[in-house]
Amino acid sequence: MKGKAMTDKDIRHRSKIYDSMVKSPNRAMLRATGMTDKDFETPIVGVISTWAENTPCNIHLHDLGKLAKEGIKAEGAWPVQYGTITVADGIAMGTPGMRFSLTSRDIIADSIEAAMGGHNVDAFVAIGGCDKNMPGSMIAIANMDIPAVFAYGGTIAPGKLDGKDIDLVSVFEGIGKWNHGDLTAEEVRRIECNACPGPGGCGGMYTANTMATAIEVLGMSLPGSSSHPAESKDKQEDIEAAGRAVVKMLKMGLKPSDILTREAFEDAITVTMALGGSTNATLHLLAMAHAANVELTLDDFNVIQEKVPHLADLKPSGQYVFQDLYEVGGVPAVMKYLLANGFLHGDRITCTGKTVAENLVEFADLTPGQKVIMPLENPKRADGPLIILHGNLAPDGAVAKVSGVKVRRHVGPAKVFDSEEAAIDAVLADEVVDGDVVVVRYVGPKGGPGMPEMLSLSSIIVGKGQGDKVALLTDGRFSGGTYGLVVGHIAPEAQDGGPIAYLRTGDMVTVDQDTKEISMAVSDEELAKRKAETTIPPLYSRGVLGKYAHMVSSAAKGAVTDFWKPEETGKK
């Protein structure tokens, strides 16, 4: 175990500020919340969740927070419950509200830091459910660097319709099938009414489950917790255990900076590749590493991608949901398999105070005969499904997810749109034909603002049967539920004057997953001419989106809002 063991006095390393005579007014306020003389002698531990009634991902988190409080009390500390915001991607998707999704990641991070810092807690548990909750919590945890544990609200159960498993993405794709004449409106309604049966994060290897898994692999969540379903007894137990664990971290003197090492991030990328995780993992892991002062770049993803096979037959490109993985051993069983075959660093410390290898000894192997995780000898794909592309269309990089995509190289004419809505209208009107390259720009971190996801558009293309025949490129993002021939995070973005701003309808575009190329057949001379003729629209400048647009970095840097120049602060 890393970290110096603390004495009882040291444990209250922040809340002891309330002890002096001059802090009598502060204590008066705290007494009104139920604290007594005895309680002032114990550590104050926060429990902060993104509870909200607007989404199944988060609707149960307040009750889970109460369980974390019980664990904290059992270890002799004083728990205090807080709330912060969430934006539900599935509800915001395809609407102007989607601009607030990625923005919310940094608001969540800032609000957790403000609440925990403003009240001098000694440690805290962060509980999240929807996509941006996880990286937002982790950015705060890394920035504060006090004992903390992240606890995931758990995955939703699959919906059932006509004896088959369905989920939210089934509804999105149903729209494309309806437009193509393959489903009636009533059939789509039946899918809609059965897709989401209760609480929990979206059920495939989408962004919420991807990031919860990555955090467990990093060592900042309890082993096994990321794959426990939202409504399971295991989930209730792991939340209570998280409360206990964070107080034990405090007693051990164990901090996030002891856990969030370069090797930890390498392992998180490794498991993300093996499970076929979301493209958003690139963005969020870069941001989390930045907060932890760990050097991580897009190129690191390609290095690991070339070595790690894709093993999981999970949605969106596979047939199983995350609950199925839980039933055959969960994330720990996958980690055991990868560790045994030399893919992970087993000697890293985790929030339990034990190493990765020591934690995994307590878990069973993958269930014999299971079909969710394929063997290394016969993987779903020989290398990882998340690929970083470069070329004259994305000099700073772009992210492609190629799981389930048979096409290795696509060359076609661009059809350029400056909004997702315009692109959707064109697809629904059958103006996009096989071979086309649909390009949606001015939707990056600054241009959106907020880098909205294109799940509505990508799902309609797949639903119309064009998933392998039409490429979709954007300086925006894709949902973890997206699959098909898609490339996002193109950097520099159009709003920053990136080459995508000067692409025109009819230009030939190449996407090649073998050479990792993304390029346009436009000469440097023609590009310079177009640049001189193009006026980039002004940055959005009102409210929170205006603040975000003016502060956010490139997607290639994780779209962080504190990317200061090293010479100004010393922080890279």
Curated annotation (Swiss-Prot):
The protein's annotated pathway: Amino-acid biosynthesis; L-isoleucine biosynthesis; L-isoleucine from 2-oxobutanoate: step 3/4; Amino-acid biosynthesis; L-valine biosynthesis; L-valine from pyruvate: step 3/4
Q: Give the modified residues of type N6-carboxylysine.
A: K132
Report the EC number(s), separated by commas if there are several: 4.2.1.9
Locate the residues binding [2Fe-2S] cluster: C57, C130, C202
Instruction: Enumerate the active-site residues.
Output: S479
* Alphabetized UniProt keyword annotations: 2Fe-2S, Amino-acid biosynthesis, Branched-chain amino acid biosynthesis, Iron, Iron-sulfur, Lyase, Magnesium, Metal-binding
Molecular function as annotated in GO: 2 iron, 2 sulfur cluster binding; dihydroxy-acid dehydratase activity; magnesium ion binding
**What are its GO biological-process terms?**
isoleucine biosynthetic process; L-valine biosynthetic process
UniProt-annotated binding residues for Mg(2+)? D89, D131, K132, E453
Q: Which SUPFAM superfamilies match?
A: IlvD/EDD N-terminal domain-like, LeuD/IlvD-like
The chain's disulfide connectivity reads: none
Does Ribonucleoprotein appear among the keywords? Answer: no
Q: Name one Pfam family in it.
A: ILVD_EDD_N
- What role does it play? Functions in the biosynthesis of branched-chain amino acids. Catalyzes the dehydration of (2R,3R)-2,3-dihydroxy-3-methylpentanoate (2,3-dihydroxy-3-methylvalerate) into 2-oxo-3-methylpentanoate (2-oxo-3-methylvalerate) and of (2R)-2,3-dihydroxy-3-methylbutanoate (2,3-dihydroxyisovalerate) into 2-oxo-3-methylbutanoate (2-oxoisovalerate), the penultimate precursor to L-isoleucine and L-valine, respectively.
Name of the protein in its database record: Dihydroxy-acid dehydratase
Q: Which organism is it from?
A: Streptococcus sanguinis (strain SK36)
